[in-house]
Amino acid sequence: AAIAGYLKRDDGIDWKGLTDYANSMYDVRDELEVADVEGNFDIETAQKAIKSKIPYLTLRPLQINPAEFRKDLQKLQDAFIEKGVINVDEQVAKLKALDWNKLTDATIKLAGEDPTAFYEVATKEVLGEEADEDMMAVIAGLLLNVLRRYFRNLGEDMTHELSKVDESKSGDAPLGCPTCGAPA
């Protein structure tokens, strides 16, 4: 229903194109199996994070293998080119030109500590300072869906631990992700 509402809007935004893009990303993201990162979840750390309201990743960063991460990005990029809805030659050429080797190991390490900061740094490393908005949207989809591979199990485990806590309150307190701290 919400999508139908957006499609009817006349605000100059290509909502149909954005919906098609998002759907094509969903179609290809499952080409990457969810990673079972060794030792990525610790119940004691989770309980400490929840109790102290500190993001889990602050206490125990997720260890991501940089070479594997770059391969995952390339695999998803290739699948997106093959199956995605981007079909304008200039945009396909830009997508093919992305070089994941520009991502430093330190930046990939940052993905396991602070995914929001990682996105900002990674975008600049891969696209440079003069990145156009279309490519920023494309790279966001690629980066976020590869991160999903690494964070999905951890996020589910944290949600399970959070469900055990009986501190339900209502009010105007800001919500943050218990795993990474991003605003919810």
Residue ranges of model-derived segments:
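N-terminal alpha-helical interaction blocks
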Residues: G5-L162
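Cys/His-rich short segments
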Residues: H160-A184
